[in-house]
Amino acid sequence: MAVISELKRHHPKTGLLRYLPTGVVPYGELVRIHRALGYYLNTSPYVVGIAYTAATAETKLPLDLLLDRLLLLTLWSLILRSAGCAWNDLVDVDIDRQISRTQSRPLPRGAISLSAATIFTACLFVLGCSLLLFLPRECLFDAGIKVFFALLYPFGKRFTDHPQLILINIAWAIPMAMHSLGMEPSSQILSMLCMCVFFSAVIVMIDLVYSRQDTEEDLKVGVKSMAVRYRNCVETMAYSLFAISSLALLFGGVLGGLRVPFVLFSVGGHIVGFWRFLRASLQAGPAGVESRAKSSCLIASVFWVLGLGIEYAEMVKEKDNPTDKKKHPH
């Protein structure tokens, strides 16, 4: 009883939560507003998808269109991530009560009722889907895939040792970004698939390393995950996924007709950022893995977009100067 009483008094003062009114804080916790890593991982594929489509398109895409789609897809990803977190906590509330790291979440500690959380979650999904009204019709199918897997994810740890594989749906942001710009993914099927494999490997790699912090308690409770299933070879799997992501990014650029700036900045920045993350996280252990992943994601994302941005700028320059003998290779 003392533990429950203490949890109910729990009022975190970290990150953005410190700026929220006391009554709103539990809802901020429910959507992980103080956990920036998840928002990076969900939003960066859309940002890269927009930049990649712009850099590899046969025709010059207007900057105002790119910014419009970037804003809409960023909002969509932020809201979907929030709704997914709330849904995950609703489904996992009984498990969360048994894991020390999650006992202080708002539902296990009783800061929000299940009925209030359910209504809040439904409103988030409706709000996110309302943004689809401003996007091409093809994006409805893409969004349906994303929502389906967001709803499925919390059940994965009950039935499979590989629930992280459900997270690869995040990579579907690439074809959704292409559709949002009026481009057909099938016209660049190989390069598009490489970019999807790239993000899939990144997502699973980070979640695999991040999940190690709960391995001992997951074993006791019976929660399944790749970190539990492969607990004796996590390092090998993590580096393998890192290699796959690096190669997939490289091939995605080459097949899309991208050149030196992409290889130097996007691929090079990815390798440096996540090599740093893996070395630090796998040597130091689970403690502090979130902050290391967050900084590495930020560094890598900046370089992913920088390389693609330079490619787009060069393509625009060539399109605007048709007399230039240098032709874009697409």
UniProtKB/Swiss-Prot annotation:
Asked if Lipid biosynthesis is a keyword of the record, the answer is: no
Superkingdom of the organism of origin: Eukaryota
**Enzyme Commission number(s) of this protein:** 2.5.1.-
Q: Where in the cell is it found?
A: Membrane
Q: What is catalysed by this protein?
A: 3,5-dimethylorsellinate + (2E,6E)-farnesyl diphosphate = (3R)-3-farnesyl-6-hydroxy-2,3,5-trimethyl-4-oxocyclohexa-1,5-diene-1-carboxylate + diphosphate + H(+)
This protein's GO cellular component annotations are: mitochondrial inner membrane
Pathway given for this chain reads: Secondary metabolite biosynthesis; terpenoid biosynthesis
> What is its cofactor?
Mg(2+)
What's a BP term from Gene Ontology annotated to this protein? austinol biosynthetic process
Listed InterPro entries? Prenyltransferase (IPR039653), UbiA_prenyltransferase (IPR000537), UbiA_sf (IPR044878)
| Summary of the knockout phenotype | Impairs the synthesis of austinol and dehydroaustinol and accumulates the intermediate compound 3,5-dimethylorsellinic acid.
Transmembrane helix as a keyword of this entry, yes or no, is: yes
Query: Could you tell me the keywords of this UniProt record?
Result: Magnesium, Membrane, Transferase, Transmembrane, Transmembrane helix
Additional facts recorded: In A.calidoustus, the austinoid gene cluster lies on a contiguous DNA region, while clusters from E.nidulans and P.brasilianum are split in their respective genomes. Genetic rearrangements provoked variability among the clusters and E.nidulans produces the least number of austionoid derivatives with the end products austinol and dehydroaustinol, while P.brasilianum can produce until acetoxydehydroaustin, and A.calidoustus produces the highest number of identified derivatives.
Record-stated family: Belongs to the UbiA prenyltransferase family.
Q: What is this protein called?
A: Polyprenyl transferase ausN
Taxonomic source organism: Emericella nidulans (strain FGSC A4 / ATCC 38163 / CBS 112.46 / NRRL 194 / M139) (Aspergillus nidulans)
